[in-house]
Amino acid sequence: ARQFGFEGVREFKLALAQDLGRTSSVHRAVSLEDDCAVVIQKILGSTAASLTALQHQLNPNTLNEAADLLAQATRIDCYSVGTTSAFMADDLQGRLFRLGKAAHAIHDAHKQLISAASLGIHGVAVAISHVGRMPFLLESVTFARQQGAKVIAITQPHTPLADMADVEIDVMVPPDAVMRVGTEAYIAH
C-alpha cells in the first residue's frame, strides 16, 4: 500500500472502495451510453454464450462421478468463499435437502475447519470457489481429505483447489470488469 502512495492498508482499501463506487459498470460489456434494449442484449447474450461454452466444457462422466459421491455420502458440507459462491452453496444445500441428503452450506473459514474435522470417510466436501486459490478454503479441503472425506471442487481448471479434488467440475467463464466473479460465473456454477 505504501508503494502506491498510501499511509497504510486501511487508506488503500478506502481509496479502492471509493474508486469502485464511482464505477457505474455492472457488467463488463455495458456502458453508460447503452439504452435498456442494448443492456438486455449484452447481458443476456454474454450469459447465453457462457452457458453454451460451459455445455461443451462439462464432462458427463465427471458429473456422474460427482453424483455418485453425493448419493453415497451420509453428510455433505458445501464450503464457499465470497458472496457469489455463498449463494451457490446455499442453493446446493437446498437442492440436496430436497433429495433427502444431510447437507450444510458453510461460509465461515473456522466452521469449515470444524466441519472438515468431522466429515470422515462417508462425508463429502463440495468446495465452491471461482478463483480456486483462497488459502483458508484450501486448508479446509486438505483437512477434510486427511479425515478420509471425498472432495468435489466446482472451480476453474488448473487451480490449487482443482488439483486437490477427487472430482473436479471445471467452470470457465470470462472475468467481469468490476467484480472478480460476475453474472456468468454465478449462473454457470
Question: Where in this protein do the model-derived segments appear?
Answer:
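HTH-adjacent hinge/linker in prokaryotic transcriptional regulators
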Residues: 1-62
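Short acidic-hydrophobic sequence patches enriched in Asp/Glu that either
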Residues: 8, 187-188
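Short, flexible segments with low predicted structural confidence
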Residues: 41-42, 67, 115-116
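A structural signal for well-ordered alpha-helical scaffolds and beta->alpha junctions
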Residues: 44, 188-189
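Glycine-rich phosphate/diphosphate-binding loops that line cofactor/substrate pockets in enzymes
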Residues: 61-75
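Glycine-rich phosphate-binding loops that contact phosphosugars or nucleotide phosphates
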Residues: 71-187
